[in-house]
Amino acid sequence: MIREKTNKISIIGAGFVGSTTAFALMQDGLASEIVIVDINKDKAHAEAMDLAQGAAFVKSVDIKSGDYADTKDSDIVIITAGVGPKPGETRLDIINKNLKIFQSIVPEVVKYSPNSILLVVSNPVDILTYITYKLSGFPKERVIGSGTVLDTSRLKYMLSEHFDIDARNVHTYIIGEHGDSEITAWSLTNIAGANVEEYCKTVCANCDGSFKKELPEKVKNAAYEIINSKGYTNYAVALAVTRIVEAILRDENAILTVSSLFEGQYGIDNVYLAMPTIVDRSGARQILDVPISNEEKENLIKSAEILKGHIANSELD
């Protein structure tokens, strides 16, 4: 009998994002084995039990909690553990708190799954992905951040609402930091093959272009608005993570705005930022050096410098 290749995914962190990601992965049937690890072992056990009891409704999957030894030989390790921003805090305010957590997590993950792909979701994601890259010693392709995959989805949704079209027919990217210095790449935004400005003029009556100022701010503030109301975000980010995992496991060569290591692109070096990137079974295969406007390039460089400054001021050795 020919056995289908199995995929093992471990999730470090059984909080709102980690547990919801496990649920999304389970529903999509992307893994044959899912292991949930958390410092709170009772919480991890309860989440795994709750998910496992729905096994009759999904494709065959073994879901369990455990410790790092149970993550051995994972194909992908998703890191969601860490301290999230409280109301009034930004993602960058929590760097050193999460640095200490990652210094305890990453060596254990590397020990048991030296050939895995590491997918960082915890915030500030670009900085923590860089930290994971340094701590792991892995090739850059195998250390990926969730980047602005979620931000890009948020913008697609908002543009779809603005123009009253399906979000899947909106093509756009948020680039740079997953955070306050992120950039909306209007030069890469199109609907039905037309640049968004031309589409606006052609299709919409009284189009004044004000959405180009309003929507980027709404995207930036979306997470803070949700956190202020319910204390955390979990659903959309879990779907974003699941999309990245799907692209990896299915070797899709998909173009996603994951956080990848820059090595000279746009004059930027030695920092993780989000940019349209080819994602396949090897991980983040290639950052696409796509043409963007001069203003977008300048803002991308500024975003990189902000992140580099925070890394330099962190407690990373």
Swiss-Prot record:
Cellular compartments annotated: Cytoplasm
Assigned EC number: 1.1.1.27
Sequence intervals crossing the membrane: none
PROSITE patterns in UniProt: L_LDH
SUPFAM superfamilies cross-referenced by the UniProt entry: LDH C-terminal domain-like, NAD(P)-binding Rossmann-fold domains
GO molecular function, one term: L-lactate dehydrogenase activity
Residue positions binding substrate: R91, N123, P124, V125, D126, D151, T152, S153, R154, T233
Annotated pathway: Fermentation; pyruvate fermentation to lactate; (S)-lactate from pyruvate: step 1/1
Quaternary structure annotation from Swiss-Prot or TrEMBL: Homotetramer.
Cited function: Catalyzes the conversion of lactate to pyruvate.
Annotated keywords: Allosteric enzyme, Cytoplasm, NAD, Oxidoreductase, Phosphoprotein
Annotated GO CC locations: cytoplasm
Family listed: Belongs to the LDH/MDH superfamily. LDH family.
Statement: the UniProt record of this protein carries the keyword Amino-acid biosynthesis: no
Catalytic residues, chain numbering: H178 (proton acceptor)
Superkingdom of origin: Bacteria
Annotated PANTHER family: L-2-HYDROXYCARBOXYLATE DEHYDROGENASE (NAD(P)(+)), L-LACTATE DEHYDROGENASE
Organism: Clostridium perfringens (strain 13 / Type A)
Record protein name field: L-lactate dehydrogenase
Sites bearing Phosphotyrosine, chain numbering: Y224
